[in-house]
Amino acid sequence: MNDVVLSCKNVSKKYTEFKTDIAILKDVNLEIKKGEKVAILGLSGSGKTTLLNVLGGLDKCSAGEVYLMGERFDNQSVNKRAKMRNKHLGFIYQLHHLLPEFTAIENVMIPLAITKKYTKKESIKLANEILKKVGLDHRADHKPAELSGGERQRVAIARALVTNPNCILADEPTGNLDSQRSESIFALMQQLSDDFGTSFVIVTHDEKLASRMNKIYRLVDGELELVINSN
């Protein structure tokens, strides 16, 4: 049985500025298996976010192939990519991107509304369950301004997980948090990965936190290198 959730083969990405090609990614190969926790390290501007966007179908590669759940992903139409993304992927960002006028539970319910598969009653139940998993069911009716930074990020994690995706792509999810809250968020993501069997790909600059992952890669000058494989 093929347990590869997300992969890319010989992926390159370049931009053209003033008639000059600038290579961001160079022949990147990566394979994410079910339940794996993978960290990608790199300096600012090394292409980490670009790689995450290409893997998530938010940006197109200049060359190479991306596969999601065994199906070619990068060459699909915009609508097909969106459907595949909504079904199989969740996203967490450095900035929580919660809607300020919505409560925690309403923010978590947004992905469920996009799928159009659940009644409001079902959505409330699912959102409450995942908020309980991240320890915030008692804050369900609070708006983002009434939550701490760590609590907002927990809501963002709940929102990413509520549709039970196969893989979470997280871009510097603890970048705006202090070390204690960062440790707590990383521990939570590890626990949720174990509980749900969800794969996590986490872009971070924090080597200490990255050391918690099964695999650690480093992106240097657009090339991805495997640093540690503890599987």
Curated annotation (Swiss-Prot):
Highest rank taxon of the organism = Bacteria
Q: Which InterPro entries match?
A: AAA+_ATPase, ABC_transporter-like_ATP-bd, ABC_transporter-like_CS, ABC_transpr_LolD-like, LolD_lipo_ATP-bd, MacB-like_ATP-bd, P-loop_NTPase
Q: Which GO terms describe its molecular function?
A: ATP binding; ATP hydrolysis activity; transmembrane transporter activity
Q: Which CDD domains match?
A: ABC_MJ0796_LolCDE_FtsE
Q: What is its main location?
A: membrane
Q: Where in the cell is it found?
A: Cell inner membrane
Tell me what topology the record assigns in the membrane: Peripheral membrane protein
Residues holding ATP: 42-49
- Pfam families linked: ABC_tran
Sorted alphabetically, the keyword list is: ATP-binding, Cell inner membrane, Cell membrane, Membrane, Nucleotide-binding, Translocase, Transport
- Can you cite a GO biological process for this protein? protein localization to outer membrane
Keyword S-adenosyl-L-methionine in record: no
A Gene Ontology CC term for this entry?
A: plasma membrane
EC number(s) from the headed UniProt entry: 7.6.2.-
Function, please? Part of the ABC transporter complex LolCDE involved in the translocation of mature outer membrane-directed lipoproteins, from the inner membrane to the periplasmic chaperone, LolA. Responsible for the formation of the LolA-lipoprotein complex in an ATP-dependent manner.
Subunit architecture: The complex is composed of two ATP-binding proteins (LolD) and two transmembrane proteins (LolC and LolE).
What PANTHER family does this protein map onto? IMPORT ATP-BINDING PROTEIN, LIPOPROTEIN-RELEASING SYSTEM ATP-BINDING PROTEIN LOLD
The family line of this record is: Belongs to the ABC transporter superfamily. Lipoprotein translocase (TC 3.A.1.125) family.
Name of protein? Lipoprotein-releasing system ATP-binding protein LolD
Please report the organism this UniProt entry assigns to the protein: Francisella tularensis subsp. holarctica (strain LVS)
